[in-house]
Curated annotation (Swiss-Prot):
Membrane topology: Peripheral membrane protein
Subcellular location: Cell inner membrane
Binding residue positions for ATP: G152, G153, A154, G155, V156, G157, K158, T159
Name of this protein: ATP synthase subunit beta
Enzyme class: translocase
Amino acid sequence: MQGFISQVLGPVVDVDFNDYLPQINEAIVVNFESEGKKHKLVLEVAAHLGDNRVRTIAMDMTDGLVRGLKAEALGAPISVPVGEKVLGRIFNVTGDLIDEGEEIPFDKKWAIHRDPPAFEDQSTKSEIFETGIKVVDLLAPYAKGGKVGLFGGAGVGKTVIIMELIHNVAFKHSGYSVFAGVGERTREGNDLYNEMKESNVLDKVALCYGQMNEPPGARNRIALTGLTMAEYFRDEMGLDVLMFIDNIFRFSQSGSEMSALLGRIPSAVGYQPTLASEMGKFQERITSTKKGSITSVQAVYVPADDLTDPAPATVFAHLDATTVLNRAIAEKGIYPAVDPLDSTSRMLDPNIIGEEHYKVARGVQSVLQKYKDLQDIIAILGMDELSEEDKLVVERARKIEKFLSQPFFVAEVFTGSPGKYINLEDTIAGFKGILEGKYDHLPENAFYMVGNIDEAIAKAETLREISRGDTCLDNCKVEQKKAN
């Protein structure tokens, strides 16, 4: 099944065959030499041009490629390694190792183009995916097998939340994670790898990188490479897998570039006419089955903060929850800096999460919203001008704000505080107590960076003892001065 290259137009390569026509999405391999080095280039069939000629998209740079070079059709789509051997390693779009580790043979490989699970195999139960992070589980819970949009600028803690989720899935759910860097900066990918190494979560995650400098084919298909690895863990091993995609916008962007290179007429704002169907095909594979689930957290870049842009707007249609990180909250020193009022979830429904959880979550949001509304009055007139009822709202809101923070396992290295995983029942009980006024007598500092409410009570006692000790010390100094 050999052919030869008839045309090279950047990342688009035309290949002619004599008596064979490769199918759409079939892989074609070209082995060639350039500047004294041997190269292996993988192409993917994108269109049939007639007369046994196919138009392909290259998965790597086409520098050094010339007309007339032999090309071999593999008779199948790009296949990538799957199974436990992929954990702790970095792969490119074609499933080759790109880290500094030793080369190992992979006995299992799956094609990256797959159908979503059959309807009868899918699980229709609405279940919460417990993360152990208070603010997420209480106010914007994730659906098992659902899709979460992670919104946040640089430096507000996206990577730390991603690593904490990977840690909690590994150690509390005995599950694995897959990270797909779609159009990532090489430096960011490198930083993430090193941080995971330091945080001891690397052996529970497979990393797939299609970096920013790579052709659009690689940046687009890397999402499918990562998803295929996650599907194996779900379908063959029956696990609940967490899949991270950073950034899902780059998936649409690279698809738009590929579409333009293939000569298709663009749609709105220059995007590919098949944007919605491509996104739908990809997102439909991320689901729960009766065996296991893939829950995905997708970082979403919004170009020029325009939520009506077709790329983010297409993603929103598929999301079950949004986790919004807020710089103003991070500046207060409250981590994770998740915005409790902006973050949403379709799971926040009394029929799914139960009446008690729903009432507590809405109560917390109501108190925080009232506090937000009162902030202008406090800034101009001060706390003394508020009614007694409003003062109580402010006090409880500040305690809630502090209690929404928690120490992370992966941040132990630089905070010195041991990480905490908080069960949903403990989270609900703690916030319910604050709303009911059970802990009005405790200082607000007692609620900062603790796990459950018992730890807040213990911290309040410790603060009281420190305060008593300081008072005693001051009294001793006064007595000493009098004696002198």
